[in-house]
């Protein structure tokens, strides 16, 4: 077992019940362009077209052969584009009767002997290939490529996260089948990373290996697991995939159709009853959270408070791979001389508030940043929350000034936005390190 000694478990109120309930009916779903880094679509449908579940809706000009399919049957009611015509979302009104595209199905014994090309082709044709992510760069891999290893995390340490075991227990066989399929994509191991007391049987066997991680967030981040087990570089790539996506892949190959089921936790201080709900892939957040929020001006975040996106307007749908929706109150108000208050109801990593004497206290965080952008001040906060074997202050400085050579030497290629989310949270200068990292990664990739 690998113990993570640095990090931060954010003491935010609104943890979900660790049991699954039926969610509200979903009337629309969407494929969000922002879920796919560097993707440039060639549209295969128009507004008003009727599509089947699993039907091709666009392909990627940048990565030849990658197909994106519809998560539901129905009518395409909107294709939203933003600045420079960047695709924001393709919105589909869900039909009452769902027609779907079918694919080949296999028995458990057949899965173990499937040809790699056949596995890749079915994943690509169904659109489930887009569930895979590369390290470095965090992109959908090119069809025909082979990773050094594949990582699956069944440990989620994000604030207010649902325990993956709750979902996997209901779909254990499909999860095992999904791991078998993933093992056909690589000659290396398929790593299943779990917590020390995960209430699940072992999945190890054949190419599938297991490792336990314990400690504070980001102990559950796949970037942490990759750093300790199979570090990447410009000439070495690994892939990762979420635990619910492994289940979906398993069902695709055993049932011959796309699974649109998803379990998403409704969490946060503004949720009336935080709990896990059954819903659909890409569900509308308005449908999902209907009648579930406290009164007030609320912000819905698709994902964790540390690394989700603001689900509103043309992107008011759940991300393809998200496992939670977090509700926060908009922090419009400003507090006069708040920095000299005792801080019984305020949280800080540093020992500056009275709340430090109240271990276990949960806070109703809002969206306020408690100040505007200012100079980056190294006060030791980054080192407190960064468990990886890198120099965070030096790396962050290199990222801010765009020194890609230094950033590469300091370990930037091992990171994605989620790996720097705690650095963003504790930063006295209010820097958003996720977008800064992404700009640097784009430059590094372009320069080779």
UniProtKB/Swiss-Prot annotation:
InterPro entries listed in its UniProt record: NqrA (IPR008703), NQRA_2nd (IPR056148), NqrA_C_domain (IPR022615), NQRA_N (IPR056147)
Catalytic activity entry: a ubiquinone + n Na(+)(in) + NADH + H(+) = a ubiquinol + n Na(+)(out) + NAD(+)
GO biological process: sodium ion transport
Highest taxon, organism lineage: Bacteria
NAD in keyword set: yes
Keywords: Ion transport, NAD, Sodium, Sodium transport, Translocase, Transport, Ubiquinone
GO molecular function, one term: oxidoreductase activity, acting on NAD(P)H, quinone or similar compound as acceptor
EC number(s) given by UniProt: 7.2.1.1
EC class name: translocase
Family membership: Belongs to the NqrA family.
Subunit structure: Composed of six subunits; NqrA, NqrB, NqrC, NqrD, NqrE and NqrF.
Record function comment: NQR complex catalyzes the reduction of ubiquinone-1 to ubiquinol by two successive reactions, coupled with the transport of Na(+) ions from the cytoplasm to the periplasm. NqrA to NqrE are probably involved in the second step, the conversion of ubisemiquinone to ubiquinol.
Protein name: Na(+)-translocating NADH-quinone reductase subunit A
Source species of the chain: Alcanivorax borkumensis (strain ATCC 700651 / DSM 11573 / NCIMB 13689 / SK2)
Taxonomic path: Bacteria, Pseudomonadati, Pseudomonadota, Gammaproteobacteria, Oceanospirillales
